[in-house]
């Protein structure tokens, strides 16, 4: 009788790469990185479509006769905007004669501002000031700052006030023979005796606690006053020094100018200019005192509920060719902590006309149609990978990827897999399966004559004396690795929290240290991924070994007395007693009875909100659905034949 030895053969050559894991190793024909690097998309986006609002002008106004050609946003996004063609927040605050006066108001955790161009050098608004850019800069900066701390905001276009009897509303030639709606100009007639200057003005205004349905915890008020170059310019009529001062209810000065105690500019001009400072005032009653002849009275404000911290995005608002723009919006956002600025790289070129419907701006704002996982000064990301090639510039919010080099991301085995600790087998693409018995048999059986001396390859066994790793030792190993991961996270969190405490009140320090902190977070995450990779490799290896043990048991049971298992994974068969069809029955049963495969593990990593720019106390914030408890062998289902 001719006896032959049939074994499960190790099929590893130079094309395989070795992957070491906790509890077992693998050879693989391919490998892939656990995550690919993502690249942010330029422009604006939002984290949640249900919690944002926008303020705009004709470029976002659905009622514009040229819409949608006039728009820089989609029709869907335009519905989120509070817009009117020709409008701007500053125009509504001051109300220059002949300009659009729109009631801007709305609520949202994330506020996007795409307006401002309608008050620019091109509009040539005068009213005692040739250049309003500095005032616009301070106004926009104050709006962004307060909006980032509020859920709701609203223009208050009519403050309650009390005006002295001797003062009447005035006009100015350099203001289209009219004047601003805010502040309003009140004057005293001193004719026919011009040397009589009139009486000091005393007026009152009230900032409400509520305007319509909008709660007001803080108001943005323009404190405006005239600036005279010398006492003589104001004092042509012998009227003393100029002053215009705002007091709170306790008599404390909160704004204005008093040339009785402050010097004049010393310049040689004959015409005063008007200055407006932006004050943040609580609701209440305020008084205004001014020198005779002129009174500038606050009659409007923007009110904010100050209920929650939120996100602010400011979009560069400039004209197309032929019109002069300013860059107050850009400068205001860049000088406001937490404000994200969207800027063009090319001149504005409109579709509807030179100033409406720019393709580059449409691309930059197209992200507003979607929800992003991360928004930052560098752009927005909606992919789930935790890594990006370059550091994302702050401010940034959401689940933002960390900067990492591609070569630093751990690789996991792919393609054909063969465990090295006591067995050999194959598996197709682990992204669709981990292992299955039908993968283990096809192409792996070979027949060898006993005399050739080809021995079997050790197969993992349930017994301590077997060639594999026991469940008990693997469980202990995984438990230790799990504890190590928790220690790594805890120590990293503690270090970052200490940094947070040091820099929580210093925005510049935050910016200086952010890169260093992010590098630490990235290194810690990469360290965790290395541990998780090793767990996965060991888990798959041990699982394959266990599955082969089950396969060997099934083969032995099918063979009965026809084959004798002489070593783990090897059997002696009498070729005269068990012919080819008999051997096929014993060793190739999977061809007629395929076994279901095991579902793949979920290896997704999820970065939580950035702790430095979202006001969060989180440190190294990563979560993963890979439960360490689920990685131990006792928690893994092994394919078994019936």
Curated annotation (Swiss-Prot):
Q: Which UniProt keywords apply?
A: Disulfide bond, Fusion of virus membrane with host endosomal membrane, Fusion of virus membrane with host membrane, Glycoprotein, Hemagglutinin, Host cell membrane, Host membrane, Host-virus interaction, Hydrolase, Membrane, Transmembrane, Transmembrane helix, Viral attachment to host cell, Viral envelope protein, Viral penetration into host cytoplasm, Virion, Virus endocytosis by host, Virus entry into host cell
Give this protein's Gene Ontology molecular function annotations: host cell surface receptor binding; sialate 4-O-acetylesterase activity; sialate 9-O-acetylesterase activity
Kindly give the Pfam families that the UniProt entry links to this protein: Hema_esterase, Hema_HEFG, Hema_stalk
Show the segment(s) annotated as N-acetyl-9-O-acetylneuraminic acid binding.
83-297
Enzyme class, first EC level, given as a word: hydrolase
Instruction: Tell me which parts of the chain lie in the Extracellular compartment.
Output: 1-617
**What's noted about post-translational modification?**
In natural infection, inactive HEF is matured into HEF1 and HEF2 outside the cell by one or more trypsin-like, arginine-specific endoprotease.
Its BP terms in the Gene Ontology are: endocytosis involved in viral entry into host cell; fusion of virus membrane with host endosome membrane; fusion of virus membrane with host plasma membrane; virion attachment to host cell
- What is the reaction catalyzed? N-acetyl-9-O-acetylneuraminate + H2O = N-acetylneuraminate + acetate + H(+); N-acetyl-4-O-acetylneuraminate + H2O = N-acetylneuraminate + acetate + H(+)
Where does this one sit in the cell?
Virion membrane; Host cell membrane
Give a Gene Ontology cellular component term annotated to this protein.
Answer: viral envelope
Q: What is this protein called?
A: Hemagglutinin-esterase-fusion glycoprotein
Taxonomy of origin reads: Viruses, Riboviria, Orthornavirae, Negarnaviricota, Polyploviricotina
Gene giving rise to this polypeptide: HE
């Amino acid at each position: 009788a001719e006896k032959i030895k049939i074994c499960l053969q190790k099929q590893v050559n130079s094309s395989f790469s070795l992957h070491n894991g906790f509890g077992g190793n693998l050879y693989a024909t391919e490998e892939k990185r656990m995550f690919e690097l993502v690249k942010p998309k330029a422009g604006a986006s939002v984290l949640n479509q249900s919690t944002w609002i926008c303020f705009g002008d004709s470029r976002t106004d659905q009622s514009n006769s040229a819409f949608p050609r006039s728009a820089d946003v989609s029709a869907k996004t335009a519905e989120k905007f509070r817009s009117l063609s020709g409008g701007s927040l500053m125009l509504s605050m001051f109300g220059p004669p002949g300009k659009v006066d729109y009631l801007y108001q709305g609520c949202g955790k994330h506020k996007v501002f795409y307006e401002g161009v309608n008050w620019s050098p091109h509009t040539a608004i005068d009213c005692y000031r040739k250049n309003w850019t500095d005032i616009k800069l301070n106004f926009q900066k104050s709006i962004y700052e307060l909006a980032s701390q509020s859920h709701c905001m609203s223009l208050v276009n009519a403050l309650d006030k009390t005006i002295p009897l001797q003062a009447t509303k005035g006009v100015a030639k350099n203001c289209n023979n009219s004047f601003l709606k805010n502040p309003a100009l009140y004057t005293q007639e001193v004719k026919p005796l011009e040397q009589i200057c009139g009486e000091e003005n005393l007026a009152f205004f009230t900032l409400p606690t509520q305007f319509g349905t909008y709660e007001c915890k803080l108001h943005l008020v323009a404190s405006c006053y005239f600036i005279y170059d010398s006492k003589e310019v104001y004092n042509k009529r012998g009227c003393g020094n100029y002053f215009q001062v705002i007091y709170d209810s306790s008599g404390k000065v909160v704004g204005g100018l008093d040339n009785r105690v402050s010097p004049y500019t010393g310049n040689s001009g004959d015409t005063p200019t008007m200055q407006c400072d932006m004050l943040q005032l609580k609701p209440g009653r305020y008084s205004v005192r001014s020198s005779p002849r002129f009174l500038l009275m606050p009659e409007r404000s923007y009110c904010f509920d100050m209920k929650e911290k939120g996100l602010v995005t400011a979009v560069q608002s400039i004209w197309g060719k032929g019109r002069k723009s300013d860059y107050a919006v850009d400068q205001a956002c860049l000088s406001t902590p937490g404000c994200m600025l969207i800027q063009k790289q090319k001149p504005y070129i409109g579709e509807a006309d030179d100033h409406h419907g720019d393709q580059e701006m449409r691309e930059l704002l197209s992200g507003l149609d979607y929800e992003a996982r991360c928004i930052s000064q560098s752009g927005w990301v909606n992919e789930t990978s935790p890594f990006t090639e370059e550091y994302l510039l702050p401010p940034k919010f959401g689940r933002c990827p960390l900067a990492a080099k591609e070569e630093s991301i751990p690789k996991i085995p792919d393609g054909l897999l063969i465990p090295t600790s006591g067995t050999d087998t194959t598996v197709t693409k682990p992204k669709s399966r981990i292992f299955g018995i039908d993968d283990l048999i096809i192409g792996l059986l070979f027949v060898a004559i006993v005399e050739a001396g080809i021995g079997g390859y050790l197969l993992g066994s349930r017994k301590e004396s077997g060639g594999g790793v026991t469940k008990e030792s693997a469980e202990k190993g995984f438990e230790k690795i799990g504890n190590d991961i928790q220690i790594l996270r805890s120590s990293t969190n503690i270090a970052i929290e200490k940094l947070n405490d040091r820099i929580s009140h210093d925005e510049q320090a935050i910016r200086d240290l952010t890169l260093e902190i992010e590098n630490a977070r990235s290194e810690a995450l990469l360290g965790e991924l290395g541990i998780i990779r090793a767990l996965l490799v060991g888990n798959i290896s041990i699982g394959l070994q266990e599955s082969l043990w089950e396969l060997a048991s099934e083969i032995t049971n099918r063979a009965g007395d026809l084959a004798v298992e002489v070593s783990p994974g090897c059997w002696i068969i009498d070729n005269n007693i068990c012919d080819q069809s008999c051997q096929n029955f014993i060793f190739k049963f999977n061809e007629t009875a395929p076994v279901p495969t095991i579902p793949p593990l979920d290896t997704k990593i999820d970065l939580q909100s950035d702790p430095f720019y979202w006001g969060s106390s989180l440190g190294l914030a990563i979560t993963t659905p890979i439960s360490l408890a689920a990685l131990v062998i006792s928690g893994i289902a092994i394919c078994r034949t019936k």
